[in-house]
Amino acid sequence: MWKWLHPYAKPETQYRICGKLSPLFAFLTLVLLGVGIVWGLAFAPADYQQGNSFRIMYVHAPTAIWSMGVYGSMAIAAVVALVWQIKQAHLAMIAMAPIGALFTFLSLVTGAIWGKPMWGTWWVWDARLTAELILFFLYLGILALYSAFSDRNIGAKAAGILCITTVVILPIIHFSVEWWNTLHQGASITKLEKPSIAIPMLVPLILCIFGFLTLYIWLTLVRYRMELLKEDAKRPWVKALAQTLK
């Protein structure tokens, strides 16, 4: 049934496919983020309560969303690698980790910048903020654990187990504003009822959310190719590729 997938399981085939897809996602990222951020910063109306300080939302909200999305994707890849013994899934997980760490860092920094005029302080030990900070440390822990072993396979398995066992942090982050009395506002665009954000503000936000998604995919494709080269450095296909680049 799955025989048609076998040719695509070869590292050299995956390397080539990722190379072909990368320019597409780079272009989509440029268009979506270019339009979304310019629209949000320059043309979206000021908020009636927050004034222009709300505009940092166009970076903060997408990076916060995908900081969780990347970790969830890593956990899925880790399960695939451990259950079905697919080595490339571990490579994909490791390829995503620095991107997720970057998104989490950006969400924390932009959140602090946004929080200063709104809350009067750069940081509070709010449930959502604290959980997001823990997520950042989990990303760093996965990268550190992977690098701690001389055997890349053992390091990848250890990092995968850590990712799977800590993925529970994601519902804690998402539902923290409902479970605890927090300063952080609730969802603005994921509600079943009418979104609590004006359409002229909402459209560029959606563009930025999809823009950061394509950025995540693009960077993952680039990093996954690098991981494939490192993993198969002594394989004939990598040596042949090196010869063509000389």
UniProtKB/Swiss-Prot annotation:
Which residue windows are transmembrane per the record?
Answer: 24-44, 64-84, 94-114, 129-149, 160-180, 197-217
Q: Write down the Pfam families for this protein, in alphabetical order.
A: Cytochrom_C_asm
Query: Domain of life of the organism in this record?
Result: Bacteria
List GO molecular-function terms, semicolon-separated. Answer: heme binding; heme transmembrane transporter activity
State where the protein is found: Cell inner membrane
Asked if the record carries the keyword Glycoprotein, the reply is no
UniProt keyword annotation of Membrane present? yes
Topological category with respect to the lipid bilayer: Multi-pass membrane protein
Principal subcellular localisation of the protein: membrane
Q: Which GO terms describe its cellular component?
A: plasma membrane
Q: Mind telling me which PANTHER family this protein's record contains?
A: CYTOCHROME B_B6 PROTEIN-RELATED, HEME EXPORTER PROTEIN C
Family as reported in the entry's similarity comment: Belongs to the CcmC/CycZ/HelC family.
Please give the name of this protein. Answer: Heme exporter protein C
Organism, by scientific name, is Haemophilus influenzae (strain ATCC 51907 / DSM 11121 / KW20 / Rd)
Query: Gene name?
Result: ccmC
